[in-house]
């Protein structure tokens, strides 16, 4: 019977600036000057010895310590509400590219749509002495950001304004995007349009989209009334509704979707004889809309809402659910192209890149009034709304 004994292995000690100085036969001051690029004060022979010592010892400078000594660490914080949202991931790609180009290092904080977690992360970022903060959060308020901006740390907001906070903001032109989508649905001849949005009381981007939808619907109603016009087939002006989908509460989602189901059935089954009410086809295929039914469309305020609607409609009406109801979404997730859903594509990469550029300018001391950079969305028309 043999036994083996193991001795805990200790990781090799990292070389320090003192080790490099000893190896190069000089003092720590000369090493610091070399690391800081002050080559003019070092002789060619000394520079060569220091370079060789660094290579032999595999010395890696402590960038955080060096940055703190200079008062700069090139670290910026980014507070994100929902990293599972494709929009956030795409914005983050632009952030990372800009950070790489500008020599910054992003510290990502994912709050998972929890307001208390957002507050804690903001407090934590101040202890890391970040040079700036980019905020795309759910419930951040001015008093939450006050410790950050009050300590002289610049902040840039992504897509969402914060009441009472004067700061740069980069994002989609939400009003224009919602108007663009609503006009497309109206011009496509839909008689009934439901704008589906998550709770919007505390999120400015959702507020702007919902308000723009209502205003666009009201404007077409006024224009049609003044001109004495009616919709296609003499059915009258299009009707608009707002449906709140609280994706964080399953019971509330079910109640909201039940309301939507009743509206879809009432609109699309109007011309069918026989039983009314819920006519979802148990065989897995949607019954086509009746010849004299009202054409109904759903306008999702973002990709998570659109996905919730699409999955529900497929489960209820079958794979051919789009023969019964159209779907348009702000955001253009990959699955939208596969299913033929019309979207309004956001310039997500540009939003992230521009946010870092704004923040970098503030870090470097640019003093201007707060800036809003509103970027246009692009309407991508697919089969869902062109049938």
Where are these regions (language model features)?
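An alpha-beta-alpha
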Residues: 179-220, 231-235, 239-242, 371-386
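Short, solvent-exposed amphipathic alpha-helices that sit
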Residues: 49, 87-101, 177-181, 204-222, ...
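Flexible loop/turn connectors
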Residues: 265, 270-387
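Hydrophobic alpha-helical segments within soluble ligand-binding/sensing domains
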Residues: 170-195, 252-263, 346-364
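Structural motif
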Residues: 106-127, 178, 242-271, 282-291, ...
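Flexible loop/hinge segments that line or gate small-molecule binding clefts
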Residues: 113, 136-180, 200, 304, ...
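N-terminal helix-turn-helix DNA-binding module of bacterial transcription factors
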Residues: 1-73
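Amphipathic helical "hinge" segments at domain boundaries
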Residues: 44-48, 57-132, 199, 211-214
């Amino acid at each position: 019977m043999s036994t083996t004994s193991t001795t805990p292995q200790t990781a090799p000690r990292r070389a320090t600036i003192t080790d490099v100085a000893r190896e190069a036969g000089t003092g720590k001051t000369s090493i610091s000057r070399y690391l800081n690029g002050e080559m003019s004060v070092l002789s060619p022979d000394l520079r060569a010895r220091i370079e060789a010592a660094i290579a032999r010892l595999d010395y890696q400078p402590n960038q955080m310590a060096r940055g703190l000594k200079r008062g700069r660490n090139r670290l910026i914080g980014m507070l994100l509400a929902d990293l599972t949202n494709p929009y956030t991931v795409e914005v983050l790609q632009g952030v990372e590219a800009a950070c790489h180009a500008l020599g910054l290092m992003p510290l990502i904080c994912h709050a998972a749509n929890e307001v208390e977690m957002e507050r804690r992360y903001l407090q934590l970022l101040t202890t890391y002495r970040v040079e700036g903060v980019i905020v795309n959060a759910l419930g951040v308020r001015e008093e939450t950001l006050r410790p950050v901006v009050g300590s002289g740390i610049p902040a840039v907001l992504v897509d969402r304004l914060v009441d009472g906070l004067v700061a740069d903001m980069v994002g989609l032109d939400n009003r224009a995007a919602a108007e663009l989508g609503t006009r497309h649905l109206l011009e496509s001849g839909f008689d009934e349009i439901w704008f589906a949005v998550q709770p919007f009381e505390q999120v400015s981007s959702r507020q702007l989209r919902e308000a723009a939808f209502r205003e666009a619907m009201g404007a077409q109603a006024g224009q049609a009334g003044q001109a004495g016009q009616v919709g296609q087939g003499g059915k009258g002006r299009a009707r608009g509704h707002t449906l709140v989908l609280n994706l964080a509460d399953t019971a509330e989602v079910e109640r909201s979707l039940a309301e939507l189901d009743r509206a879809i059935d009432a609109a699309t089954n109007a011309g069918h004889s026989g039983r009314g009410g819920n006519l979802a086809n148990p065989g897995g295929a949607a019954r086509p809309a009746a010849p004299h039914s009202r054409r109904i469309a759903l306008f999702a305020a973002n990709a998570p809402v659109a996905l919730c609607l699409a999955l529900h409609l497929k489960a209820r009406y079958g794979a051919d659910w789009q023969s019964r109801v159209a779907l348009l979404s702000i955001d253009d997730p990959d699955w939208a192209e596969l299913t033929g859903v019309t979207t309004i594509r956001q310039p997500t990469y540009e939003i992230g890149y521009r946010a870092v550029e704004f923040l970098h300018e503030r870090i470097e001391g640019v003093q201007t009034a707060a800036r809003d950079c509103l970027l246009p969305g692009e309407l991508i028309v697919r089969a869902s709304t062109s049938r």
